[in-house]
């Protein structure tokens, strides 16, 4: 059994090691916890930073993300000093601490002088996971040695698979005295190491600094003994996560003051400043305070003056509210898991635990777990969580079927016995019990199987640890009965079916007898649908929470009253032991219902109920639901007696009822908002503005970053911190405007005079100064200069406004998939996406129709349209040639081509068989056909001639035979040659046939001998194959057992690799289709979004067109630059493609007059007047009125003024709206990716080869028999009589040869004409060496021939 240690469980780390190297001088004295330093991490001088991989940066500042300590964090002193005794509490938490991302250590170099030598001592540190010899531990241990009277310090670094002692410790230099021996690991064999190396350090340094962190399975180490910034030491890929670190106690007789200050590392952004020599001289933790964030925003240690929008802040909780229902009983899950009986997979058992408490650490300590992993939830979160209830299913695991239980896998267990629901939050526990403490129960849960005789005895004689599982499941209708009717002839015995069921059917066989036959032939597992009947036993797969509905049933084994089936009638099940190494393997599936909501809670991290703090931001844990919020007490009557939690429509916690006091509360989120930092370059810190938030809310809660608070006050913009309130005054220039007419002014003199302020003051910003005119009539609100137009010209502006657009409809399925069926089938899984797309486009088209109707209504009355402008462009496509795309078209494309060939140019050939006389006959005639009868051959005393005649011979013999028949008996002698010729040639045919017959007998005899030898060879081969088969079958059985062992560990192996590949190909194809669908749906979605945006723009432009029709075309607009450029005169409108075309005429100013104007005048100190549609202007120290559109001074009269009741001016400032340009703060990508791969458990493979039977084959006898058969075959050589092949040429007639001769002469004449009479002119006959001129001189050609013998 390969045991997997669950490092995620807190109880797994009771001590650092598990090997008891020593038990002497060990006690349980509590010496306290590690002390906390009064010094904090100050990163400004580089403390906690490092030179990244020793890279050099010159005279620059860099923003780097990495693992750094938090600025302002404290240290813990992890050093432990002993003399003789060690405390067991030293080797447990908090001294054994989580490593997480990494640690930064500040180690004091404790120097002790003895005998004139100054010794250097400090403790060793180890970093690892389980600290056993199956995992690597990193050890950094100091050692000193005296060389020539000088002390040399070494850092011995090793990364090895140490077996760590339970109480590890180191000792000081032997010269300082020791009462213990150094003992921190114990390994009898050679230790496997990845890294070993020694580094020197300065023994005179006051402090040493270490920087250890891990990232992506790689460990990084940095170190320095000079300065604060650490330098690269080494890095090493481990591939595992280091979980803990431990500073080993140092024992020494001498009085040493040890300090090993450690602070954790986390992912931070730092601003690092380097000088011209590449030395890091300043560092900033960007998230430590507001000033640091300003530096990082500007990438400068000395940021310039400005107003900076920071990343904001979140009010931090000031208290914790914890609620659990008290006095709940213990769930006692471990007792049920350790029960004396456990079910088989076929009849797996379930139990629900609710309204009780459980302890995961206690549970794991009571069972021997092989592995524990969770699906859709982090396993470590189970400690301290609450659930509505926990449902646990368990059963014994057959040894060969454990692989079936992997989440998402298939196989017998998950297909036909127990299906794991991957959609819910669940955890899978694999554990084992001793064989003596457990037995496996067998029970068939199928009601219809048990109705027809299946009981526990039907499983036969099974061992106490044999687990029964189904290999196929079958379901039947309620009316099913397997017994036949008595009217059937043949088959099994009759039976009486229960009431309400249907007896087995019969059908008329070929013999016309009523014969009984099974519905499912030959059995339901192999039934393929024969005859006209349908097998009522239908194969099914189970779903989560279902048992197998029934095993298969062979109906011919059922009979009796009532109908009962024999045990062997039930098929499709198997059994196998659950024992392995003397323990029974058991599977338990924890189904977690209503995660973080309920009264079934883990007590591992449970706390006591606290007081409910209201109206401030708090951390809450309410019956397992955790979060942050502000609790507001309300009087709610809508909770029922069994309800404690209230949710909103989005599924978020909205309120709760306290179980103890019955009080009800609403939950509001803690404030998270915008912060503006106002910074002046001459100041060392900024003033802050918490937008839209009162100071009482800011300081009643704890904000994210601590502030050196000087003063604060509420303003129109929000809470202002560290600035002086000076809103009674105003400034005309401001470098730090904050909006809404306010300014934060920095006054250096103010800070030097008033030490309680920061030099910032919050005041009004008025960038203008009113220059009042001394007059008996006083202007109201000041006197200002503006320009008023005095001369004009007529201008024209042509404007097009779109009021409609083409309608768009999309066939979504065709757009995405075309006509690809697989794509369309998978597209259906996307639900109503396509319907939604078309619905949106329909809404867009309806919106366009409505908009067009509104535009048309505005044009119906009072507007004359000009001739409609032609919309659209004619595009002629008739001349486009598509043949390059479509290829060749028409009947000419497939016409077959013809060719000529010269076959047997000179003669026609006829071949015939020759037994020896044809060649001699041919040699005798020499080609003279008249010598035919003279050259008669003799073959074994018989006169013979070849059975072949030429045309001339046929003519001659025919003429002779004809002459002999014309004038008998005078011409009878002329027929003698003919008759001899026929007889001799018949003899030739007979001789040839006789030779062929003799050869045929020889072939048959030799073939019979060969068959005997072949048969003997086959017998020998068969005997050898029988032996081979026996050995191969034995090894196949062994291999089958091995494959079963492998399948337990490596995954379900299909019947063939081709099936696996086909499934993988199908999955890959489906994944690729899904990617393509997603891509095309994204494009379609973007297009539809663009259509929505465009339709909105069209709607707005159409509304603008309607407004311009009403105001510009139907009337004269008083608005400047609305109907054209300038003051409107007249507008015309024309219809245009997809819109309206406007022509505006207006008069445009060409010259302006600068005038002094006032918004009003105050007469007699209490009566005010203001201009009506114009301005009051001061002309030559007298007040007059002029219109706003053109300069034309006229006296102030009652027609151009409005009388006011007072001269006072009410000032109102509109609030400013500023866009939040901060980037969303997304979670770390690595952390988010980690959520998908956490808590993955593995099962070690069992690669035992005990089942393989290695057998050697002895096939010598069979090989000898085969050799004898080969000899017989070799002796079956057939010596056939030679039958030659004679070729007889049939010559062509004389006129054919004449034509060939004439054609040759013509060709020679043509060649002479071409070569000698053309091409080179008349001079060709003058050349001796060739027919063509050679201007480079005569060249001789030497032709050499060679003959190969």
From Swiss-Prot:
Chain segments carrying region Heptad repeat 1 = 1000-1050
Q: Which residues form the BetaCoV S1-NTD domain?
A: 15-298
Q: Which residues are glycosylated?
A: 59, 133, 198, 437, 456, 635, 662, 682, 700, 725, 774, 923, 1180, 1210, 1220, 1239, 1253, 1274
Which GO biological process categories is it annotated with? endocytosis involved in viral entry into host cell; fusion of virus membrane with host endosome membrane; fusion of virus membrane with host plasma membrane; receptor-mediated virion attachment to host cell
* Start and end residues of each stretch annotated as Fusion peptide 1: 900-921
Organism whose genome encodes this protein: Porcine hemagglutinating encephalomyelitis virus (strain 67N) (HEV-67N)
Q: What is the lineage of its organism?
A: Viruses, Riboviria, Orthornavirae, Pisuviricota, Pisoniviricetes
Among CDD domains, the record links this protein to: HEV_Spike_S1_RBD, HKU1-CoV-like_Spike_SD1-2_S1-S2_S2, MHV-like_Spike_S1_NTD
Record topological domains on the Extracellular side: 14-1293
UniProt xrefs under InterPro entries: bCoV_S1_N (IPR032500), BETA_CORONA_SPIKE (IPR042578), CoV_S1_C (IPR043607), S2_sf_CoV (IPR043473), Spike_N_sf (IPR043002), Spike_S1_NTD_MHV-like (IPR044339), Spike_S1_RBD_bCoV (IPR018548), Spike_S1_RBD_HEV (IPR044380)
Identify the main location. Answer: virion
Keyword tags: Coiled coil, Disulfide bond, Fusion of virus membrane with host endosomal membrane, Fusion of virus membrane with host membrane, Glycoprotein, Host cell membrane, Host membrane, Host-virus interaction, Lipoprotein, Membrane, Palmitate, Signal, Transmembrane, Transmembrane helix, Viral attachment to host cell, Viral envelope protein, Viral penetration into host cytoplasm, Virion, Virulence, Virus entry into host cell
> Domain BetaCoV S1-CTD, which positions?
329-603
Its membrane topology is listed as: Single-pass type I membrane protein
* Quaternary assembly: Homotrimer; each monomer consists of a S1 and a S2 subunit. The resulting peplomers protrude from the virus surface as spikes.
Which parts of the chain does the record assign to the membrane side Cytoplasmic?
A: 1315-1349
Q: Where is this site: Cleavage?
A: 754-755, 899-900
Annotated region (Heptad repeat 2) at 1244-1282
Sequence motif: KxHxx, positions = 1345-1349
Cite the SUPFAM superfamilies for this sequence. Coronavirus S2 glycoprotein, SARS receptor-binding domain-like
Query: Which ranges form a coiled coil?
Result: 1029-1073, 1255-1283
Q: Which GO terms describe its cellular component?
A: host cell endoplasmic reticulum-Golgi intermediate compartment membrane; host cell plasma membrane; membrane; viral envelope; virion membrane
Q: What is this protein called?
A: Spike glycoprotein
The annotated region (Fusion peptide 2) lies at 919-939
Q: Where is the signal peptide?
A: 1-13
Q: What does the entry's PTM section describe?
A: Specific enzymatic cleavages in vivo yield mature proteins. The precursor is processed into S1 and S2 by host cell furin or another cellular protease to yield the mature S1 and S2 proteins. Additionally, a second cleavage leads to the release of a fusion peptide after viral attachment to host cell receptor.
